[in-house]
Amino acid sequence: MSHPALTQLRALRYFDQIPALSPEQLDWLLLEDSMTKRFEQQGKNVTVTLIQEGFVSSDEVSSELPLLPKEERYWLREILLCADGEPWLAGRTVVPESTLSGPELALQTLGKTPLGRYLFTSSELTRDFIEIGRDADLWGRRSRLRLSGKPLMLTELFLPASPLY
C-alpha cells in the first residue's frame, strides 16, 4: 500500500546549498528538534497514519542507499503525521538491519507512535546533516540520524496544510 504524498516524497530533489526561503520556512525545514513536538506546540493533537512498516530489500530504498551501509534488508516505515486529523507531513524512515540491535529494536514496534517520541528521548541521538528538497510546490528534508552511533535515514515532506506554507 502507498499514498500519493509518499510518491511525492520519493520524488524530492535536494539542494546543494540552503535555498533562499523566508526565515519562518527555514525555521521549519532546519529544525533539529522533534517535528512531532513542534506540531504539538501549535496546539494540535498529533497522530500517525501508518502506511507501511516492515523489512524490505535494498531495491526499495535505492535513494537512501548512498547514505547508509550496504545491507541485505532495511526496516522501512512510511507514515502520515496528522494534526487534528489533517495530514501535515509524510514521513519515510529507512533503518539498516544492523542498526536494529539493543534499544534500537524498539524502532520495529513503533506502530502508530510518532518517531520523534522515540528518537528525541534518547540521549544517544545525533544528526549528521539536514538536506532541503523540493518537488513541485512542496518542500521536504532528509536527515541521517544516529542512535548510539548507528545510522538511519529520515525523509519528511511538508504537506499543503502544514504551517510551513
Curated annotation (Swiss-Prot):
Major site of localization recorded for this protein: cytoplasm
Disulphide linkage map: none
Name of protein: Chorismate pyruvate-lyase
A GO molecular-function annotation: chorismate lyase activity
Calcium among keywords: no
Entry's transmembrane regions: none
Keyword Cytoplasm (UniProt): yes
Natural source organism: Enterobacter sp. (strain 638)
Keyword terms of this UniProt record: Cytoplasm, Lyase, Pyruvate, Ubiquinone biosynthesis
Subcellular location(s) of the protein: Cytoplasm
Assigned GO CC terms: cytosol
The enzyme's E.C. designation: 4.1.3.40
Family named by the database record: Belongs to the UbiC family.
Subunit description: Monomer.
Reaction catalysis annotation: chorismate = 4-hydroxybenzoate + pyruvate
Enzyme class per UniProt: lyase
GO BP annotation list: pyruvate biosynthetic process; ubiquinone biosynthetic process
Pathway it works in: Cofactor biosynthesis; ubiquinone biosynthesis
Function: Removes the pyruvyl group from chorismate, with concomitant aromatization of the ring, to provide 4-hydroxybenzoate (4HB) for the ubiquinone pathway.
Chain residues that bind substrate: M35, R77, L115, E156
